[in-house]
């Protein structure tokens, strides 16, 4: 760790984090604390259909609120622009995102575009001009994207058959609520896809050349939680402890992204998903083990360090054996959770 001591680092994370069963009740206090009079809620029809937005709507009834629930699964530039135009000049004091990565990304984009003198297309050219316009609360309903912790938002660009990230620290949410009740009934298929996405976050962040002692701390702890709990959460719908660990692991992965960024898996995943319209977690899963194997010689020391953190019982193994073990575990997790491994 000596190399870290001689460098300086910055890590920006959400300033208010509520975690644990029924932590969504804290939304009442947030609304009061921020003196909120009007709220814009982003979600999707699936989340509303299964009742995951009911509690949020009940709490929001104490003030004026509007719900946007017709976002596409992988929002394109035109989708986000449509929503921004629909909202128009209406003033909101708070934006709440209730859903997976796409919903939260759209929420974060709205928080920096509504009321601003620049557009989404301006941000695609230069995201450094962004400024927070409206405070945000992120309430994830999956255990994988980590969007509730990041300064990133991804939009699809169909004409280029790709996706692009907008990155600016002003998009980091002001409040995060990690309530396991929100993922208690999450289908195994979604646990698998979003969980492997979270696993890619922590592994890529830890092996990134931009890794720091701060991002490492979150990436290692996130890796421990995800490697040890993703199969449990996938196989046992009643294992709320495993799901809570997955939710926290995904959040840690998001924090790690802010500190070091992802690497080749995600870089290849965006055009794959953009061209073939594959869910983000699935496109990562298709590539994950193969990319890590291809790059192993350049990051095997870091993979071995990660293995030491996640599987301390393998401490006597060689660096190569530890690196191989992590890569094999990645492949086995994808197989064990029945994620497609080809187009």
Question: For each predicted feature, which ranges?
Answer:
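Short, Lys/Arg-enriched N-terminal segments with co-localized hydrophobic residues
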Residues: 1-5
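ATP/NTP phosphate-donor binding region
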Residues: 6-94, 343
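Short glycine/serine/threonine-rich phosphate/pyrophosphate-binding segments
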Residues: 24-27, 49-52, 77, 102-107, ...
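Glycine/threonine-rich beta-strand-loop-alpha-helix active-site module
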Residues: 78-85, 89-181
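Glycine-rich phosphate/pyrophosphate-binding beta-alpha loops
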Residues: 144, 251-284
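Carboxylate- and glycine-rich phosphate/diphosphate-binding segment that chelates Mg2+/Mn2+
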Residues: 152-260
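Gly/Pro-rich interdomain helix-loop hinge
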Residues: 275-342
